[in-house]
From Swiss-Prot:
Subunit note: Component of the periplasmic nitrate reductase NapAB complex composed of NapA and NapB.
Annotated protein name in UniProt: Periplasmic nitrate reductase
Keyword Ribonucleoprotein: no
Entry EC no(s): 1.9.6.1
One GO CC term on file: membrane
Position of the signal peptide: 1-31
Similarity comment: Belongs to the prokaryotic molybdopterin-containing oxidoreductase family. NasA/NapA/NarB subfamily.
InterPro entries given in the database record: Asp_de-COase-like_dom_sf (IPR009010), CT_Nitrate-R-NapA-like (IPR041957), MoPterin_dinucl-bd_dom (IPR006657), Mopterin_OxRdtase (IPR006656), Mopterin_OxRdtase_4Fe-4S_dom (IPR006963), MopterinOxRdtase_cofactor_BS (IPR027467), Periplasm_NO3_reductase_lsu (IPR010051), Prok_molybdopt-oxidoreductase (IPR050123)
SMART domains linked to this entry: Molybdop_Fe4S4
Residues engaged in binding Mo-bis(molybdopterin guanine dinucleotide): 83, 150, 175, 179, 212-219, 243-247, 262-264, 372, 376, 482, 508-509, 531, 558, 718-727, 802, 819
Biological source species: Pectobacterium carotovorum subsp. carotovorum (strain PC1)
Family matches, as Pfam families: Molybdop_Fe4S4, Molybdopterin, Molydop_binding
């Protein structure tokens, strides 16, 4: 194969990106564009993280043969991270599932049987039987679904509609509960609306970046490349990084701070105190646009009610607050002096003061970025609220180059889990099931009888595990996630419920993951561009793609699975007589007829698709299903700050940031001149709140649920690495990525290893109060924990890191704290 100069330059750009991960790109991949005349190219957002990079997908003879960064994509401008360059290979693992598999013995289902191929009809037969039995015997609370921030927008929408409207069960929750729930609740408490007010364009306009619990260099590398360019091109730009251990983002930091776990709360309050004491409050902004409230404290740790920590809490799970004056708030944060904060956090005084001065300087534009370090936190909502406090005190918000920005880890945690509302308490467009008016809006748009949607919040992710274990949740569908590996406290709280003979577990996945192998029925799913899809990224950018290849074997998209399953239920089987009496025309119909084949969702014919355009779902059902569902969903948000563009606009664009009003996207919300919902003369209006004012909360430092003691003498923090994504179910099937980081290791300070007679490369047993795992000692490399803390990634199915973790959650968001538990080490 010969390379032109142009292709040679492209290949070298790819190779340079790969070098960051220590990977050699095969010539065949580097030269993927060489035969571009024979390859068909089309756009799609990347399948991995929440950055939302645009890629060009090359197909040939019904297979994906190449991918490259999309030069017209505003997010990444033609650059991909190393995972993005290997996107084609995630589709073609040797163990790709192509048939439904049921545990069987002697020709029938057996919980202890062997996985046996069956037809889709038989798969849906037994699923329907198990769901109908649970509904009949125990009601809607006995069924549930655990979904995903990786599902497409219409997949999540269809699943939420089936459960909340069809089955009348709010027991549907996404794996975004484990990563973004604290951000959601934090946004809602402070602003009354979810998601960031700024966008990635802030990067090129700011003077300072502050990272709180976010290793962007590895977890959001494309954004990090833009930050790096901004920092190295402008000597006046500053980067501050705060974490419980040193990582690759520290390499660019002007001020890198390692703090004791959980004490970020104290640091945030110290900064607020510094701003007030040094007369750096933006009085004009603060007086006009901010309210103050004192939050309830001692709220527990989201453990089972019988746990001693929950029994001891004065206000378990309370999100109550009361108004307070500025003088009262000033007195509250005054307790967080520099000296006290140094003592609590372990960060040197000069570094803390430099950080506070950065925020306080009225001439400096500042962006705060955070990810799991804030969110996976037993006070994650508080951490989110406290960083908003700093930006609201200084007025550094909703303007180019200024603002707090919660980064997401999954490609559609925003677009699907949050905006669609696949959480157990949410409906589309920030509506909630507990609000009667919101339920009425949903019932009207969905053409349901009044009272169909239950008002009780469903089971969140960790509560689902507990209910399965307790035998109260009996029919359970897990879709597009690997929670048996990714969720907390596996042995004590998850595995028992999955293997309980009272329960029937279904897993939809393209690969035999740990979760799939623990299930009773596995449904093979289409991946990424094997279906038409849409994602929403961290900057409110909604992006579409078309189906580009067919899925292998009998694999079907999650959308097809949800909609097809609805055909198995007559309305009379799931709705009581009082609901049917309101809609007599629905008698004799199925949930498919009512929810997915009604006069709204079927109004776009197949003729809108090009003759040769792949769209397996629409051609199967006989109408443009994705468009019908999207336009129905979009009606929830149009006119009140969640406006989405018409469906067809997204196929033409490289994404649009909502609210999209009169064809124009919004870069910065809540500020005059940028947001169409802010009127002339208002300057700012936080219109999620009735009075248009954001809220500053007084919230204290409170300790972690579990900390080291004499026996379990080390903190354990868990997370990811550059080469692998989440549990590695896709990336570990890419040979190059697997070779680059083949197994998980335990990163430990050299002195901590020496004190335990452990050497680099030796096996080590990590033990918590919940279980133990054997890993390999690593005293060098990219992650450098301080003494007293160890770090372990969770991508390796052979080392089930989450056997160790505690199922403590933020009591307000119900998000798990994967960053803090106590362990001890033993030689193997």
């Amino acid at each position: 194969m010969k390379l032109s100069r142009r292709h040679f330059m492209k290949a070298n750009a790819v190779a340079a990106a790969a070098a960051v991960a220590g990977i050699t790109i095969p010539i065949a991949v580097r030269a993927a564009t060489e035969q571009s005349e024979a390859i068909h190219w089309d756009k799609a957002p990347c399948r991995f993280c929440g950055v939302g990079c645009g890629v060009l997908v090359g197909t040939q003879n019904g297979r994906i043969v190449a991918s490259q960064g999309d030069p017209d994509a505003p997010v990444n401008r033609g650059l991909n991270c190393i995972k993005g360059y290997f996107l084609p290979k995630i589709m073609y693992g040797q163990d790709r599932l192509t048939q439904p598999l049921l545990r069987m013995r002697d020709g029938k289902f057996d919980k202890e049987g062997e996985f046996t191929p069956i037809s889709w009809d038989k798969a849906f037969d037994i699923m329907a039987e198990k769901f109908k039995t649970a509904l009949k015997e125990k009601g809607p609370n006995a069924i549930g679904m655990f979904g995903s921030g990786q599902s497409t927008i219409w997949e999540g929408y269809a699943a939420a509609k089936l459960f909340k409207a069809g089955f009348r069960s709010n027991n549907i929750d996404p794996n975004a509960r484990h990563c973004m729930a604290s951000a959601v609740v934090g946004f809602m408490r402070t602003f009354g609306m979810d998601e960031p007010m700024g966008c990635y364009d802030d990067i090129e306009q700011t003077d300072a970046f502050v990272l709180w619990g976010s290793n962007m260099a590895e977890m959001h590398p494309i954004l990090w490349s833009r930050i790096t360019d901004r920092r190295l091109s402008n000597s006046n730009v500053t980067v501050a990084v705060l974490s419980t251990y040193q990582h690759r983002s520290f390499e660019l930091a002007d001020n890198g701070m390692v703090f004791t776990p959980q004490t970020d709360l104290a640091i945030l309050n110290y900064i607020a105190n510094y701003i007030i004491q040094n007369n750096a409050v933006n009085e004009a902004f603060f007086t006009r646009h901010v309210n103050l409230r004192r939050g309830v404290t001692d709220i527990g740790y989201g453990l089972r009610p019988t746990h001693p920590l929950e029994k001891a809490a004065k206000n378990p799970g309370s999100d109550a607050s009361e108004p307070m004056s500025f003088e009262e708030y000033k007195a509250f944060v005054a307790d967080y002096t520099l000296e006290k904060t140094v003592a609590i956090s372990g960060v040197p005084a000069d570094q803390l003061e430099a950080l506070a001065k950065l925020y306080a300087d009225p001439k400096k534009k500042v962006i705060s970025y955070w990810t799991m370090g804030f969110n996976q936190h037993t006070r994650g909502v508080w951490a989110n609220n406290l960083v908003y406090n700093i930006h609201l005190l200084t007025g550094k918000i909703s303007q180019p180059g200024c603002g707090p920005f919660s980064l997401t880890g999954q490609p559609s945690a925003c677009g699907t889990a949050r905006e669609v509302g696949t959480f157990a308490h949410r409906l589309p467009a920030d509506m909630v099931v507990t609000n009667e008016k919101h339920r009425a809006i949903a019932e009207k748009l969905w053409q349901l009888p009044t009272g169909t949607i239950p008002e009780k919040i469903g089971l969140h992710a960790v509560a689902q595990d507990r209910a399965l274990k307790d035998g109260t949740l009996n029919a359970y569908w897990v879709m597009c996630n690997n929670n048996m590996q990714a969720g907390p406290n596996i042995n004590q709280e998850r595995m028992p419920g999955w293997r309980d003979p009272r329960n029937f577990i279904v897993v939809s996945d393209p690969y035999p993951t740990v979760s799939a192998l623990a299930a009773d029925l596995i449904l093979p799913t289409a991946m990424w561009v094997e279906k038409e899809g849409a994602y929403g990224n961290a900057e409110r950018r909604t992006q579409f793609w078309r189906q580009q290849v067919k899925a292998p074997g009998e694999s079907k998209s999650d959308l097809w699975q949800v909609v097809s399953f609805a055909k198995r239920f007559a309305v009379e089987e799931v709705w009581p007589e009082e609901l049917l009496a309101q809609k007599p025309a629905y008698r004799g119909k199925t949930l498919y007829d009512v929810l997915f084949a009604n006069d709204v969702t079927t109004r776009f014919p197949l003729s809108e698709l090009a003759e040769n355009q792949l769209n397996d779902e629409s051609r199967d059902f006989g109408f443009y299903l994705q468009k019908g569902l999207f336009e129905e969903y979009a009606a929830f948000g149009r006119g009140h700050g969640h406006d989405l563009a018409p469906f067809d606009d997204y196929h033409k664009a490289r994404g649009l940031r909502w609210p999209v009003v009169n064809g124009k996207e919004t870069q910065w919300r809540y500020s005059e001149g940028h947001d169409p919902y802010v009127k002339a003369g208002e300057a700012y209006r936080f219109y999620g709140k009735p009075d248009g004012k954001a809220v500053i909360f007084a919230l204290p430092y409170e300790p972690a649920a579990e900390a080291p003691d004499d026996e379990y003498d080390l903190w354990l923090s868990t997370g990811r690495v550059l080469e692998h994504w989440h549990t590695g179910s896709m990336t570990r099937r890419v040979p190059e990525l697997h070779r680059a980081f083949p197994e998980a290791v335990l990163f430990i300070h050299p002195q901590d290893a020496k004190a335990r007679d452990l050497r680099r490369g030796e096996k080590v047993r990590i033990i918590s109060r919940r279980g133990e795992v054997v890993s390999v000692v690593e005293t060098r490399g990219r992650n450098k924990p301080p003494r007293g803390l160890v770090y372990m990634p969770f991508f390796d199915a052979a080392q089930m890191t989450n056997v160790l973790t505690l199922d403590a959650t933020d009591p307000l968001s119900k998000e798990t704290d994967f960053k803090k538990c106590a362990v001890k080490l033993a030689k193997v």
